[in-house]
Amino acid sequence: MLSRQGIDYDSLVKEDRVHVSLYTDPSIFTDEMEKIFNRGWVYVGHQGEVPRRGDFRLKRIGLQPVIMVRDQDGQVQLLFNRCRHRGATVCQEENGNARSFRCMYHGWTYLLNGELTGVPSIERYGADFKRNELGLLKVPRVSDYRGFIFGSLRPTGTTLDQHLGRARDEIDLFVGLSDADDVEVVSGVHKYSYQGNWKLAAENSMDGYHPSIVHASFAQALIDKITHVPTPEQHRIDRNFAAFRGNTKDFGNGHVMLDYKLRIYDALNGDPSPAVSAVTPRGQANLDELIRRLGPERAANLLREGGTHTFIFPNLILIGIQMRVLQPISADRTEVCLYPTLLKWLTPEVNAIRLRSHEAFFGSASFGGPDDSEIFERVQDGCSAKIEPWQIIGRGLHDERHEDGMIIGDLSDEVTQRGIWRHWKKLMTQGSTASGAGRKRTVSAIALKRGARR
């Protein structure tokens, strides 16, 4: 069998299409875990998930188990969840508060900063046993941007700022209503899994073409709700709802965005009070507090932007008030974790509205999440058909624009999918030395292999 390094990704990723084996081939999945998740920056969690000393939450970087914990000094640590003795995990609870981590196999005990502090019958190891060198291993590089914690398993490489690039502006927008410390991630996590490749969720989250089809009933209900503002200003919203517009953006480094903001602020000629007050009687009070905290100009800009809808390569999606994390499990299985966020300074009433809006689209009994999962599994199943092994991602290719270092297209264009795949191929081909006939696994070779499996 040819080595994974011999896969010819140039033959599998074209400008306007990608080969279905990229969603189905286990060897390609293994290669992704090494070249993308084990080498680059990966989003791990938000500091708001572990607000107190001793708070922890289990995470993964690729397939590797990690504990995110706030240690006894108040620092957030990323520790590998693996005892240094015989390799058992030292923490099984998904989240909680602890003073230490104790391996249930032989009782080795570690402090929250990873230091090995207890070894039963330590004298049997002899005088050369160096307890201070056997703490839990730490993720080599950890960096924080506005409360978003990223880890890299490589000790050297690009900085987090270099990796994020222009996507930092979208993180700024996500927390723009607040300081980083004011973002709370304490409402739990909604998890679901689907039988499909992780990249299906990445592509779909930035797909502006499908909502009017897949989510038609929810979209109509949302439009009815937004445009039904029971005030004398109703006609202004109806008349100006054409302010709804959007586009797709490729920032580079695999970070892409669906910019389909409703622009209600502009539709109301700069006065959002009628719409805000219609949502909740306390809406105007929160609007006044926002202006007081940020000043009129910054508050106006945030209201005008109306939130972000961004994919940060390879596993973080920011949509509205929600952080969504993709966790690959295998070539045909993925777990998705959704974290709704609250703001400390908002009234409980408005924070409750934030949660209800999350549940309406993404909850287990909601419209949106189940719709998307069904599509992912249908696409994965369809990839088993070998008669036509290509997925088309060329929509809008003829008309995309290069502006200010970005690639921009219309809202339903596949600029975002192309941006993800462009960076994916770059990472998968870096350092490749395979060349020549017989050394690279080409489209034809993979097709033959897939046929043989049948």
For the regions a protein language model found, what residue spans apply to each?
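Rieske [2Fe-2S] iron-sulfur-binding domain
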Residues: E49-D169
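Short Pro/Gly-enriched beta-strand edge/turn motifs at strand-loop
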Residues: N38-P51, S121-Y125, R304-F311
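Short, contiguous pre-domain boundary segments
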Residues: G6-L22
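Non-catalytic, topology-defining segments of multipass membrane proteins
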Residues: M1-R4, K14, A452
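Short, flexible segments with low predicted structural confidence
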Residues: L2-D8, I171-F174
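C-terminal catalytic domain of Rieske-type non-heme iron oxygenases
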Residues: R70, Q75, P140-R454
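Glycine/alanine-rich phosphate-binding loops at beta-alpha junctions
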Residues: L22, P26-F37, V42-G62
